Regions:
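Glycine-rich phosphate/pyrophosphate-handling loop used in enzymes and phosphotransfer proteins
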Residues: 1-211
């Protein structure tokens, strides 16, 4: 029996013992996301008109920018988010981040590419970089969820991924617990770029949620 047949048998046994489930309702689903949850996700999509800076949904086209972006200077050109952070998305992301559901990240990435491939290709990023975790947090969790997203997006779009050059220099408080000004203060001097990094024109920065 050759290796391909052995691997297929292994995969069949694994799928029987641990069947793939929808990341949003945990029902067994071989297609990734079940039909019922796809309907819910369609309603949770961040739609146009979007803020021209951060990508959040805004009330009218004439507005152009959300309130936060009109009063805050950002160090990036444009942000994009796929879904609003509401149930079942927020519960699914929580499982992805804190309960070792790494497969969810692959499914999220596939959905992100479906929605934003043309936009990303228009940006022509030289590399993709995941937002890093502090080493102690990564050791505790076992993985960086943003890195899973970045690597899958890079694989699909054939864009190099650099997950080593951007580093977290100090531990920070969870952003979701902080107000706007506290978030800015929390992240100040929290990141650095290694001196070995060779500068490029465009970087696609990836994280699991926008705060």
């Amino acid at each position: 029996m050759n290796h391909k047949k052995i691997n297929k048998i292994k995969e069949s046994i694994i799928s029987l013992l641990w069947p793939e489930v929808c990341p949003f309702c945990q029902k067994v689903c071989r297609d990734g996301i079940c039909k019922e949850c796809r309907k819910k996700l369609e309603l949770l999509k961040v739609r146009e008109p979007r803020c021209m800076q951060c990508g959040k949904q805004i009330r009218s086209v004439e507005q152009e920018y959300c309130y936060d972006c009109m009063h805050t200077h950002h160090y990036y050109e444009r942000g994009l988010s796929l879904w609003n952070h509401k149930n079942p998305v927020n519960q699914s992301v929580y499982q992805f981040k804190y309960h070792n559901q790494r497969r969810y990240g692959i499914l999220y990435s596939q959905e992100l590419v479906k929605e934003f491939q043309k936009e990303i290709e228009r940006w022509r990023p030289d590399i993709i970089m995941p937002v890093p975790l502090h080493p102690s947090r990564k050791r505790k969790r076992g993985y960086n969820q943003a890195q899973i997203l970045a690597e899958e997006i890079g694989k699909i779009l054939e864009i190099p991924v650099d997950s080593k050059s951007l580093i977290r220099t100090r531990k920070t408080s969870p952003q979701k617990k902080l107000g706007h000004q506290e978030r800015k203060k929390n992240l100040k001097h929290a990141f650095a770029v290694k001196h070995t990094f060779q500068a490029v024109k465009r970087v696609l920065l990836v994280d699991d949620i926008y705060t």
